[in-house]
Amino acid sequence: MDVNASKVDPKLLELLVCPLTKGRLSYDPEANELVSEKARLAYPIRDGVPIMLISEARKIEE
């Protein structure tokens, strides 16, 4: 894991949902992203702040 990567507070992770599906998110520490498996999107975390904009999310390819 990158030393500069931030950790996500588990309580925050319980509150945040995918803006598209309203489903749960999981934290990917290697990519420092919040992942919506249902929407197949990964939301970046920049300077410790989750960017919960669909337009900023990375599409997850299989």
From Swiss-Prot:
One cellular component (GO) term of this entry: cytosol
Pfam families in alphabetical order: Trm112p
Family from the record: Belongs to the UPF0434 family.
Name used for this protein in its record: UPF0434 protein Smed_3047
Lineage of producing organism: Bacteria, Pseudomonadati, Pseudomonadota, Alphaproteobacteria, Hyphomicrobiales
